[in-house]
């Protein structure tokens, strides 16, 4: 069995590995459209830990495991109290013995890091307060799939230095992941937001190191909406999440109307600009209906590619761990178990006949 690898952060991947995952995603998407997804994870189980509810993450991982011939076990919020009823170490070890992979959507990044530290099977990061790497893989794959300048090119032939991605809004975990994967590939990333909600310096430092390694790209954090001009991608996210409801009014005042993605903003970006949103969206709050439902929007194609991404990631990380027994070995154990059960069946029938005969004799007396 190969050494266990985990998917915690796109920073852990090389450019070559990202392209490998993209190629795998493309093959599996084509196979799904043909109704011919190979059952590469047949009889395998994925434990899915959710510390908060989710629609797209849960459905996409469950559907992906089903298509690949496996099964996803949903461990809902409140069902597991990680580190409370049972230590995180113990929970991880138990799941490692029963399942073939663990996906975790955690409140804290530390939880996923510790899962990966203790697990004997691959751990996939389904979202934390710091990042959302499965979303990032999905998003860049979608960008390259739909941008006219890139959709017909091999990944190695793409001029990433010519691509401009503009993220408008709060410094969310999606913003963090988008900044880091785009700069790792050598793209130009711009975060436009009120100063209070701009990306922190530690995120920018990682992006600058990525740019240095890629030898192309740039990163800019600003409150200047003029920087949206020439964007290939205009991306936004919710202004607040469920645990920030008490800040909602304050955040609306900070973002509205200046940082809403409106038809006028998309016009400023240019006709080439495509609109993206990780969803769920608060319509007519961070984005207007006229934008998310427009021909420039690929938000729902992006959502579909969550399934594509999960299929690719599950195969990339779980498949190498599978012990691929020969048919002869499978036939041996099948025969052995069937022979045992046939013997048990005969024994049971004999006991059943004896008990019935005994009962009838007793009743006659």
From Swiss-Prot:
The record lists putrescine as bound by: 277-280
EC id:
2.1.3.6
Instruction: State the superkingdom.
Output: Bacteria
Return one GO MF term.
amino acid binding
What residues bind carbamoyl phosphate, as annotated? 54-58, 105, 132
**Record bears the keyword Transferase:** yes
Q: Which UniProt keywords apply?
A: Cytoplasm, Polyamine biosynthesis, Transferase
Lipid biosynthesis: is it a keyword of this entry?
A: no
Site annotation (Important for structural integrity) points to: 29, 145
The UniProt entry's GO CC annotations, sorted and at most eight, read: cytoplasm
Principal localization? Answer: cytoplasm
Where located? Cytoplasm
- Pathway(s) this gene product operates in, as recorded in its UniProt entry: Amine and polyamine biosynthesis; putrescine biosynthesis via agmatine pathway; putrescine from N-carbamoylputrescine (transferase route): step 1/1
What reaction does this catalyse? carbamoyl phosphate + putrescine = N-carbamoylputrescine + phosphate + H(+)
**A Gene Ontology biological process term:** citrulline biosynthetic process
Assembly: Homotrimer.
Q: Which family does it belong to?
A: Belongs to the aspartate/ornithine carbamoyltransferase superfamily. PTCase family.
Question: What is the role of the protein in this entry?
Answer: Catalyzes the phosphorolysis of N-carbamoylputrescine to form carbamoyl phosphate and putrescine. Is involved in the degradation pathway of the polyamine agmatine.
| Full protein name | Putrescine carbamoyltransferase
Q: Which organism is it from?
A: Mycoplasma mycoides subsp. mycoides SC (strain CCUG 32753 / NCTC 10114 / PG1)
